[in-house]
C-alpha cells in the first residue's frame, strides 16, 4: 500500500475513534450505535466497518489508545526526573500520580468514556480481557515499585507490595470516578499528590513526607 494511502487510512481511523469518543461521552456505550459514530465522523454508515468489525472493537481500540497515551505520559514524567530522584520509589510514585492526574484533566472526554470500561468488563468478555491485560501490566510495575521501596526502607517491613499496588490503583480509580462525577468540586492533581505522598501503606518518616511535599501540585 502506498505511503499516502496508509497515512490517509490511519487518519480516517483516528477520525472514527475521535467520533466514537464523542458519542460514547454523550450517550454512553449501550445507546451509541455505529450509525451514530459514522454520522459524528462525517462518513457513510458503512465506513466504520472498514476499520472495526463492530462497536465493541471500536471501544476497545479507544481504550487501548488511551492506555498507550497514558503509559507514554507516565514514562515521560518518570524519565524527566533527575537521576537521584529517579532512584527513590516514593518520588517515582509521586511522578506517576502527577502524570496520571495531568493526563486525565487534559483529556476529560476520552477518560470519562473509559471509566465505563470497568463496568462493561463485568459482562463484555472482550472488553474484560483488554482491561485485565492493561491492569496486569500496571499492577506489575507498581508492585515492583513498592518492592523496591520496601527494600529501601521507604515502606514498613512486612508490607505486601502486591496488595499496596492494588490499594494505590483503587485510590487512583476512585479519585478519577469522583472527579468525573463532580467536575470542579476538587483538584484531582492535589488529591492524587496526597495519595502518592502518603502511599498505600502510609507515610514512612521524613523521607516520605519530604518527597510528597516536593512533588505535590
Predicted regions and their residues:
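C-terminal peripheral helix-coil segments that are non-catalytic and often amphipathic
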Residues: 91, 95-102, 139-140, 144-152, ...
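Hydrophobic alpha-helical connector segments
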Residues: 61, 75-110, 161, 165-168, ...
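Amphipathic alpha-helical segments used for helix-helix packing
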Residues: 104-129
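Helix-turn-helix
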Residues: 15, 19-57, 61
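All-alpha amphipathic helical-bundle segments outside canonical DNA-binding/catalytic cores
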Residues: 129-135, 151-167, 189-190
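Short, basic, alpha-helical segments at the C-terminal edge of helix-turn-helix-like DNA-binding modules
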Residues: 64-70
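Short, solvent-exposed amphipathic helices
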Residues: 109-110, 130-137, 144
Amino acid at each position: 500500500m502506498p505511503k499516502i494511502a496508509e497515512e490517509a487510512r490511519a487518519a480516517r481511523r483516528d477520525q472514527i475513534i475521535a467520533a466514537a469518543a464523542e458519542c460514547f461521552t454523550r450517550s454512553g456505550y449501550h445507546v451509541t450505535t455505529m450509525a451514530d459514530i459514522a454520522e459524528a465522523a462525517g462518513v457513510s454508515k458503512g465506513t466504520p466497518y472498514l476499520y472495526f468489525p463492530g462497536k465493541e472493537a471500536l471501544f476497545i481500540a479507544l481504550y487501548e489508545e488511551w492506555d498507550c497515551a497514558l503509559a507514554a505520559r507516565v514514562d515521560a514524567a518518570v524519565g524527566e526526573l533527575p537521576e537521584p530522584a529517579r532512584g527513590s520509589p516514593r518520588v517515582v510514585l509521586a511522578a506517576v500520580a502527577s502524570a496520571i492526574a495531568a493526563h486525565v484533566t487534559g483529556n476529560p472526554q476520552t477518560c470519562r468514556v473509559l471509566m465505563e470500561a470497568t463496568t462493561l468488563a463485568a459482562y463484555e468478555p472482550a472488553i474484560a480481557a483488554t482491561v485485565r491485560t492493561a491492569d496486569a501490566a500496571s499492577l506489575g510495575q507498581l508492585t515492583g515499585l513498592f518492592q523496591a521501596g520496601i527494600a529501601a526502607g521507604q515502606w514498613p517491613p512486612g508490607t505486601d507490595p502486591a496488595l499496596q499496588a492494588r490499594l494505590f490503583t483503587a485510590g487512583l480509580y476512585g479519585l478519577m470516578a469522583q472527579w468525573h462525577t463532580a467536575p470542579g468540586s476538587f483538584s484531582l492533581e492535589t488529591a492524587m499528590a496526597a495519595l502518592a505522598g502518603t502511599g498505600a501503606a502510609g507515610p514512612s518518616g521524613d523521607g516520605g513526607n519530604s518527597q510528597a511535599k516536593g512533588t505535590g501540585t
